[in-house]
Amino acid sequence: MLKEVVGAGRQSHCTFSPSPIFIFKYLWISLLIVFSLKFSLVDAANSFPNILMPSQFVLDSSPSCTKMDLKLNYHPVIGILSHPGDGASGRLSNATNASYVAASYVKFVESAGARVIPIIYTEPLEVIFEKLDLVNGVLFTGGWAKKGLYYSVVEKIFKKILERNDAGERFPLYAVCLGFEILSMIISKDRNILEPFNSSYMASTLEFVDNVNIQGTVFQRFPPYLLEKLSTDCIVMQNHRFGISPGRFEQNKELSSFFQILTTSNDIDNKVYVSTVQAWDYPVTAFQWHPEKNTFEWGYSMIPHTEYAVEVTQHVANHLVREARKSSNRPPAQKVLESIIYNYSPTFGGKAGKGFDEVYIFT
């Protein structure tokens, strides 16, 4: 065959006609090389992802500033009610009229872009109401006081909050731990509504109730992966000896008509209690757990400080301040400055290795 081809080549131009098998092998090897190169490039891109900035993929990337919404208040102020004592069992102040606000609550609010005015519960009622006129929302903290003057002041402030919302002003309230418990007592009109639970100094999950609608609630802007983490990881801090079981909560018409249950949790003995509620008709959210501790308290080893736990704290703080920005209250700036928390200095109490790291003490 070779001789015939060579011989023919002497007489005329030779054309090479490869066999089909040869063509198949050539194409197959070429395809393998192409695919190999392609997947190598994909692997390299995945190992070192190229993060494109907006100017790299937007044709018109000329900068433009987002217009301010004139309906929103971009200087919101939150009032935090002080609690009896010094927050350290008398180690920092044994004054009989002492009250305190843990600095973690202040930082919690400030981290979301608001300022704080302390509402000192022992002040005359007219002074407390004057301070309410300077703020765009209120936070009731954790603690132990469930009777006497403190209970009475919480009740009166809560009534004012509802009145302002009924009058058309958006005026949010957060109630944490003790705040949750006192609100439950006030709304249910039952001082004995609470039940004992074994949930002191422990981290836990949050279990969302079946078919719950989180639209408009504190959880609305949580990313899906974080909602899942709340149900699978112990990333919220619990520290309470009382609470309300879902059954008792639902049986009380006043409570169930005012609040919807968003989440439940289990105590050490696996008893289920209501852990997060949202008012049906008001911007009022109550937590049996402590959203402020994950980022701002270090006194106990069981406080979760993972990235997910810190993210929970930030989202919860953002929701409160987002609601406060909707408040139509625009108090005089100088009046706010005269009452703002910056007029006070926090006291470091963390040297004992337990309790609050910092507290604001008022006497």
Regions found by a protein language model. Name each.
Residues 2-282, 291-363:
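N-terminal beta1-alpha1 cap of cysteine-dependent amidohydrolase-like domains
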Residues 286-287:
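Active-site regions of oxyanion-processing enzymes, predominantly non-cytosolic
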